[in-house]
Amino acid sequence: MLDERCLIVEHAEIGSGYRLLVLDAPGIASAVKPGQFVHVRVPALEESALRRPFSVFDAGEDRVSILYKTVGRGTAALNLAKAGESLRVEGPLGKGFPESCSGVALLVGGGYGVAPLYFLARRFAARGIESRLFVGGRTKADLLALDKFDALGVKTFPATNDGSFGTKGFAVVPLDEELRGLREAGSAFEFFACGPDGLLKAVSDRAVSLGVPGWISVDRHMICGVGACYACIQKTVSGNARCCVDGPVFNARDLVWS
């Protein structure tokens, strides 16, 4: 784990309420794996000793990118940071996704849950592993970075609650349609998911019932990042796990959903 002072290279709005933060972070960029996260200290907050956790959207060439949604005081304060300024960033933290896959990698995300999935898709593309993305949002504006997945050659299956783009409904609607075809063809596949709990439970249930690997990135508020505060608990078959050190990526068969 590293603690770097990172220059802000770019900080731009990429949609209503969504921003992309690009940092010069050579140490973290060379060490981080898809699914791991970083802790960012937000100077504008009085309690800035407590850092905010963010998934890594991409990393390489000495840079780390973070895609985030403005949802509270922490991210609202982070919005004020400008290119040319610097931030204290700690990472990489947590356990990420496996970077191997037997068959087709089915990436399932909701909203900004696509953030770690893009990093993973890029790694899979470099290894010649086929990925397919199933992504959901309330409206088309909540479907992020589809052009970047397209550039990797990833076939995308968008879904929106209001039917404004792609299939009407949740991401599991096009996922289930694709699963039928894969099973009929006898194709191997694995699940990789990140997003709201309802989506993660749905993907976990499918992985367990089909007896195939499922890797689930659980979204919790990881305050300390090192397992000390027990604020990011997730129930598992072995008891309570701390998402910041035991996850955030878990095997679907180990998760217990209430």
Language-model-derived ranges and their functions:
Residues 2-83:
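Ferredoxin-reductase
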Residues 45-54, 94-101, 244:
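Short, Lys/Arg- and Gly-enriched loop/turn segments at beta-strand edges
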Residues 73-216:
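FNR/FR-type flavoprotein reductase catalytic core
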Residues 140-142, 164-165, 221-225, 250:
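Short gly/pro/ser/thr-enriched loop/turn and capping motifs at secondary-structure boundaries
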Residues 197, 219-248:
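Local cysteine-cluster metal-coordination motifs and their immediate loop/turn environment
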Residues 245-258:
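Short microdomains enriched in Cys/His and/or Lys/Arg
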